[in-house]
Amino acid sequence: MKDCANDFDFCTPTRVLFGKDKINELPKVLGAFGKKVLLVYGGGSIKKNGIYTKIQELLKDFDLFELSGVEPNPRVSSVRAGAKICKEQNIDVVLAVGGGSVLDCSKIICDAAFYDGDAWDLVIDGSKITKALPLVSILTLAATGSEFDCAAVISNPDTNEKIGILNPLNFPKVSILDPSYTLTVNKKHTAAGCADIMSHIFEQYMVDG
């Protein structure tokens, strides 16, 4: 095991807006990138906790498109679907609302929006990523740290692969963190998120590279 007192160099270019009701800054944040927005979310919890309705109200002057149903351990099929919308609708910015899976999927959607081939190519060979749409996130579950890193993990059931990728183009431009959005998360998933946070911290000292 490495010496846990090792020096390190830490940098994240993501702007973090932390606090209650920071979502109210969303129109200004997204407006800096354009008016066509792709909203990406998972199983629909944002409709139960009111975030979805709030976003609709705030973005009434925007052209809002949606990709819902992003899976835990997001699949490349969801990435493909999102990239298709981005290309067909000339999306300016992607808004990811959810936990790490939604954010990971959204990162590769941003990459694939400028790629003519299959999105899976970008996962297995990050050098093919040359440009990405701007990504803004609203976090609803504290766990992986995907809201301010450049990592993404995507699954491909057809090849039975689950691959992680790191690319500096995948840093979210802005992440909105309102702790009140995590209050509806049940005890089981809150505990799992805490374990996830700790494991990601510990692995930095145990894994080379």
What feature does the model see in each segment?
Residues 1-93:
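ATP/NTP phosphate-donor binding region
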Residues 21, 50, 54, 74-77, ...:
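Conserved active-site and cofactor/substrate-binding residues in soluble primary-metabolism enzymes
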Residues 65, 95, 134-138, 174-177, ...:
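Hydrophobic/aromatic beta-strand patches that form the interior of the parallel beta-sheet core
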Residues 86-126, 132-140:
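A short, small-residue-rich loop immediately preceding and capping a beta-strand
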Residues 103-105, 142-148, 162, 183-186:
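Short, well-ordered, mixed-charge alpha-helical segments that flank or form enzyme active sites
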Residues 135-160:
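A gly/ser-rich beta-alpha-beta helix-loop segment of oxidoreductase catalytic cores
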Residues 151-209:
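Carboxylate- and glycine-rich phosphate/diphosphate-binding segment that chelates Mg2+/Mn2+
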